[in-house]
Amino acid sequence: MNAKVISIYAADTSGVCSALYELGGMTVVHDASGCNSTYATHDEPRWYDRKSMIYISALTEADAVMGNDGKFIRDVAKAAGELSPKFIAICGSPMPAMTGFDYSSAAEEIERETGLTTFFVDTNGTHSYLQGAEGAFLNIAKLFCCEGKEKQANSVNIIGATPLDFSVNTSVSSIKKWL
């Protein structure tokens, strides 16, 4: 049997993390460890020279089975209090997807506790990084690109330029020079 589709090299969670990396927010992947460790060790070259607030929730089997959503909410709120991000983004992996974790409610509760804009990007760790990045960028546009905001003269947004597509670290600076 021949494969008709070649699987993509990075998951939707990597797309979210890559899209939001430089925006000053805190991104939390709700997972035991697998999704974020692959992203951190293979997909993201910016770790070498730039800090970011991308974390894993360290979901345990017991928390997943027993539905200990409060621990996730408390941990994210506590970290946000210590780190002072501009916003909070949460995304998911296979285990919380299988147990039916309610990301919308968790995001609302985290926002209520922290006072920070909090949103979730609908991921489950099994789709393409393109879907994750798209979801992240759409959330940012809906929440932060408002009518009536003053436009910066002679400026342009370079949306979607992440190392997942532009792997050479100088690619984005080359795009900026060209513009």
Q: What role is predicted for each listed range?
A:
Residues 1-179:
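An N-terminal assembly and electron-transfer interface module characteristic of large anaerobic redox
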